């Protein structure tokens, strides 16, 4: 796999669109090697520290030991998520893990937009606390890495390894597109990786506390997010 440059301005299509990997990581390791060859340390991994995140952090650590990883701290995450981040810092001390917060504190957001904005206008809340901070974090970065998998949802089913990201005017690299939910957990268990203990208590997908619900059937890896609403994405992976 050649390390030739793919940028937002010259992107035509995923150069590996017709590649069907048959290695033990379903192509993830080779895509990460390509990404770090092309973009070096300028590429950023935006990690939510979910199950897919544990897989990617481990794979990235084997490819680029001083990689930059950004966590969008909305100030609304579960304590278990914050605890996991500290565990990851200990396990992978050479990785550069950055905590990115919104411009507004929760108190300032309430004063400006009203209390519990996530209930009344969840899209606006996601923009303030997740999308805008990631825009800032990716400013000047030619590419970023995401843990999207095709199996996760209809809206993610067409994701390629290398994508033109209209939202952030960047290249989005998605090494796990061919992974299933079972693949993710098999890798975690086989490699004895740390993970968020909420996964063992009915939380397949873990985000902010107000927008994450416990579910009885955890076979759907996106179940429990924005329950009772039509919302299925925070907006990081949509173009508008």
UniProtKB/Swiss-Prot annotation:
Location of the protein in the cell: Cytoplasm
Cofactors (names): [4Fe-4S] cluster
Signal peptide: none
Protein's UniProt keywords contain Aminoacyl-tRNA synthetase: no
Pfam family, one: PAPS_reduct
Keywords: Cytoplasm, Iron, Iron-sulfur, Metal-binding, Oxidoreductase
SUPFAM superfamilies cross-referenced by the UniProt entry: Adenine nucleotide alpha hydrolases-like (SSF52402)
EC number: 1.8.4.10
One GO term of the biological process aspect: hydrogen sulfide biosynthetic process
InterPro entries attached to this UniProt entry: APS_reductase, PAPS/APS_Rdtase, PAPS_reduct_dom, Rossmann-like_a/b/a_fold
Binding-site positions, [4Fe-4S] cluster: 125-126, 208, 211
Molecular function in Gene Ontology: 4 iron, 4 sulfur cluster binding; adenylyl-sulfate reductase (thioredoxin) activity; metal ion binding; phosphoadenylyl-sulfate reductase (thioredoxin) activity
Protein's name according to its UniProt entry: Adenosine 5'-phosphosulfate reductase
Organism: Oceanobacillus iheyensis (strain DSM 14371 / CIP 107618 / JCM 11309 / KCTC 3954 / HTE831)
Lineage: Bacteria, Bacillati, Bacillota, Bacilli, Bacillales
Gene field: cysH
């Amino acid at each position: 796999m050649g390390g030739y440059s793919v940028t937002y301005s010259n992107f035509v299509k995923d150069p590996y669109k017709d590649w069907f990997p048959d290695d033990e990581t379903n192509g993830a390791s080779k895509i990460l090697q390509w990404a770090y060859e092309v973009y070096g340390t300028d590429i950023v991994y935006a990690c939510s520290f979910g199950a897919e995140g544990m897989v990617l952090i481990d794979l990235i650590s084997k490819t680029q030991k001083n990689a930059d990883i950004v966590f969008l701290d909305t100030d609304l995450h579960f304590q278990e998520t914050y605890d996991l981040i500290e565990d990851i810092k200990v396990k992978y001390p050479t990785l550069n893990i950055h905590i990115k917060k919104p411009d507004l504190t929760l108190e300032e957001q309430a004063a400006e937009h009203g209390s519990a904005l996530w209930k009344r206008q969840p899209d606006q809340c996601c923009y303030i606390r997740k999308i805008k901070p990631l825009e800032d974090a990716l400013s000047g970065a030619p590419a970023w890495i995401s843990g999207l998998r095709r199996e996760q949802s209809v809206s993610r089913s067409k994701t390629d390894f290398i994508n033109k990201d209209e939202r952030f005017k960047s290249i989005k690299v998605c090494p796990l597109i061919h992974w299933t939910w079972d693949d993710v957990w098999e890798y975690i268990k086989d490699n004895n990786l740390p993970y968020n203990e909420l996964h063992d208590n009915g939380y397949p997908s873990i985000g902010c506390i107000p927008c994450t619900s416990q579910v009885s059937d955890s076979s759907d890896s996106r179940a429990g997010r924005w329950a009772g609403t039509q919302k299925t994405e925070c907006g990081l992976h949509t173009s508008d």
